[in-house]
């Protein structure tokens, strides 16, 4: 709404953007439009949340460390039940909620490890494997290993469905351009 306007970090704007250039330039309006398109799609109004979940956000990665957080992918049901002190109108999921999560803000919670796994999936055509950081532990008496990770049989965490190779290429190229073109890397 007008009280909570959404705009690009570049106050003059970037002009017409594609998904690839939107990623490369970190142009929020590209993602606002994407979020709104999902919100107003009567068949899949929570399709963006489905995409996030399909890529492993909102659930643990299975790393061999204690107390891993699952994060949160908010949706209409979550908002309705979470904000119990708010009015019924304020508890309704709206386009602003969707545009916020489209840029990773608002009520969405993801861990750095979940994002690393999502990037792993982008690099591997949708395949994600359970990450490991624990290699071995020496027994208390120092005589041998109490545990040793053998690295055999990588355990697949999930495989996100890729709609098309060209869609995946757009995202990969946008990520490449973040680093290797004059974009937000100069900011």
Each PLM stretch: what is its role?
Residues 1-187:
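Beta-lactam-recognizing serine transpeptidase/beta-lactamase-like catalytic domain environment
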């Amino acid at each position: 709404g007008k009280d909570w306007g959404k705009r690009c970090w570049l106050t003059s704007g970037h002009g017409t953007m594609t998904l690839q250039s939107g990623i490369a330039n970190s142009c929020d309006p590209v993602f606002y439009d994407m979020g709104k398109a999902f919100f107003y799609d009567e068949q899949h109004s929570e399709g963006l949340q489905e995409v996030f979940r399909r890529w492993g956000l909102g659930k643990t990665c299975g790393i061999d460390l204690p107390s891993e957080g699952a994060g949160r992918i908010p949706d209409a049901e979550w908002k309705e039940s979470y904000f119990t002190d708010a009015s019924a109108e304020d508890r309704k999921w709206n386009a602003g909620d969707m545009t916020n999560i489209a840029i990773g803000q608002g009520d969405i919670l993801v861990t750095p490890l979940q994002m690393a796994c999502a990037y792993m999936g982008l690099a591997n055509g949708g395949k994600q494997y359970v990450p490991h950081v624990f290699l071995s532990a020496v027994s208390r008496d120092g005589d041998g290993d109490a545990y040793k990770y053998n690295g055999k049989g990588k355990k697949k965490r999930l495989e996100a469905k890729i709609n098309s190779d060209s869609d995946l290429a757009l995202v990969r190229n946008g990520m490449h351009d973040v680093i290797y073109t004059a974009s937000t890397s100069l900011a």
